[in-house]
Amino acid sequence: AISRSPSNTTEDESSSKQAPKMKTLIKICGLTTASAVECIIENSVDMAGFVFAKQSPRYITPKNAKQLADLIPKHISKVAVMLHPTPTEVNEVIDVFKPDYLQMDAKDFLNTYIPKSIESLKVYRDDGCLDLSLISDSKLTLFEGTKSGSGKLTNIEHSKAVSKKKRVIIAGGLNSNNVLNVLNKVGPLGVDVSSGVESEPGLKSEQKIIQFIRIVREYDEKKNNE
């Protein structure tokens, strides 16, 4: 490419150069059915989360998750969501499900071996003791409340403080009624929704998924036109 100095660039050339369009990353978590997976594919989400924590109503076995993940195109990242797993559980999920990302509490990664082919998605919780200096400046991370899947909205001011400094996905209690407010006030890199797009615990509503995605993409479009 030929570089031009500012003095050699005409006004028409300058106006034709557009800044990269902003796109909020969308992660739909807790997928358990083929219909929900097909819905997120058709509506262009960025990350698909499968929960391997047995205490969750969204729990899915690695084998069943692999069958659903095989439907997902490569441009959508597959995320294995685990909570305080044993090394054996981690190895089974990695071997059978073959995720792009492994999502766990940041502390869980300290004693867990992860192959270099898999990205880590560390979860930092809004527990009032968070040290921002511990969060990577370059790696994608997730910020949510003290308990996953509770449906409780993460503190807006705390989310804002984290998002200003880090590459953060905001999770915890998001739904179609509050995501726009969070986007406007926090402006995170991404949003993660689970219970907020369900008809009942563990069962995704395609209508709610579509509505949530539409609100986020309309926000993106408005921001890009400002």
Feature-to-residue mapping (PLM):
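Conserved N-terminal beta1-alpha1 strand-loop-helix module at the mouth
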Residues: 19-226
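Low-acidity, Ser/Thr- and Arg-rich intrinsically disordered low-complexity segments
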Residues: 2-10, 14-16
